[in-house]
Design a protein with these regions (language model features):
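Phosphate-binding beta-alpha-beta segment of Rossmann-like dinucleotide-binding domains, i.e.
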Residues: 88, 96-150, 169, 317
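Short beta->alpha connector loops at strand-helix junctions that form conserved
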Residues: 32, 52, 73-74, 90-101, ...
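Glycine-rich Rossmann-fold phosphate-binding loop(s) that bind the pyrophosphate
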Residues: 156-157
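N-terminal Rossmann-fold NAD(P) dinucleotide-binding loop
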Residues: 160-161
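N-terminal glycine-/charge-rich "phosphate-binding" loop or analogous flexible N-terminal tail
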Residues: 1-46, 171-175
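Rossmann-like dinucleotide-binding domain for NAD(H)/NADP(H)
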Residues: 92-93, 229-318
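Rossmann-like adenosine-cofactor binding region
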Residues: 56-61, 173-175, 180-273
Length: 318
């Protein structure tokens, strides 16, 4: 049975999930966290390494000659040098689609927090705002309906499609920026360009993977062409935006709000520009982390391992 080492298990399973489906397939060693300086020592005898955010570089791969398989406990696998892994005969598998519903739900939660101001009014009422009112309904800033409002989605993978489905229920006008043919998009979703999305939408929501080509594509130039007061939502990757440009657009009012579950550096430094910018709604990378979604990750990783050991690897990204 293979020697299996999980390098950073804590965020996936702080104690509420069972490792049994993985442990039954090999000798499993689980570390809650692994500093980069200890990766090689801890994985030296491993044939299978499981990781979430621990980085595996070509240099590290060269020092792990027994390694045959890397299981990424996530959909995104940019923490692994997959080209170097392939060149060294190491298979890399990810976990696709485990969190489609969870992330789509969180996207709507962030969006509705901005438009419906739930947190804002809850805080005002804790301060006695409503109790002092002479009227049954009291508001100082109106909430917004999404019916007829243009919401543009950048990327139409599983999550983007699910968000589109939810928005259509609320009768929003949903547009998509995607390389896919318009005929393949969900009913009622129209394909537009990136410039058109930022210039004509009330809300833009990011749902694309991070690549070197689109890193920080939401930059000062794009934001200068955006509709005044645009609401930007990001549950994809923090590095898709230029932090300084977005912070400055929030300061100037060019952006009306930025609601995100991801930042370019996680955890962020205390002086991260997004954290102190006005009209930001930041959650600490929790969209994926429902108990149901985390349980699916463990199950699919176990299925990936079983398939690999049977000689028919699945969900291969290398």
């Amino acid at each position: 049975m293979p020697n299996i080492v999980f390098l950073d298990s804590f965020v996936l399973n702080p104690g509420d999930l069972d490792w049994g489906v993985l442990a039954e397939q090999g000798q499993l060693t689980v570390y809650e966290r692994t500093p980069s300086a200890e990766v090689v020592a801890r994985a030296a005898e491993a044939e299978v390494v499981i990781l979430n955010k621990v980085r595996i570089t070509a240099e590290i791969l060269d020092r792990l000659p027994r390694l045959r398989l890397i299981l990424v406990a996530a959909t995104g696998y940019d923490v692994v040098d997959v080209v170097a892994a392939r060149e060294r005969g190491v298979t890399v598998c990810n976990v696709p689609a485990y969190g489609t519903l969870a992330v789509a739900q969180h996207t709507l939660a962030l969006l509705l927090e901005v438009t419906n101001r739930v947190g804002q009014y809850a805080q005002l009422n804790r301060e006695g705002y409503w109790s002092r009112s002479r009227d049954f309904s009291l508001w100082n800033e109106a909430v917004e309906e999404l019916s007829g409002v243009r919401v543009s989605l950048i990327g139409m993978g599983n999550i983007g499609r699910k968000v589109a489905e939810l928005l259509r229920v609320l009768e929003a006008e949903v547009c998509a920026v995607t390389s896919q043919d318009e005929s393949t998009l969900p009913t009622g979703v129209r394909k537009i360009t990136l410039d058109e999305a930022f210039a004509t939408s009330r809300i833009v929501s990011l749902h694309c993977p991070l690549t070197e080509q689109n890193r920080a594509f939401v930059n000062a130039s794009l934001l200068e062409r955006a509709a005044p007061g645009l609401i930007l939502v990001n549950t994809a990757r923090g590095a898709l935006i230029d932090d300084i440009a977005v912070a400055e657009a929030l300061q100037s009012g060019r952006l009306g709000a930025y609601a995100c579950d991801v930042l370019s550096t996680e955890p962020p430094a205390a002086d991260h520009p997004i954290l102190s910018a006005p009209n930001t709604y930041v959650t600490p990378h929790i969209a994926w982390a429902t108990a149901a979604a985390r349980g699916r990750i463990v199950r699919i990783m176990a299925e990936n391992l079983k398939a690999f050991l049977a000689g028919a690897p699945q969900n291969v990204v290398s």
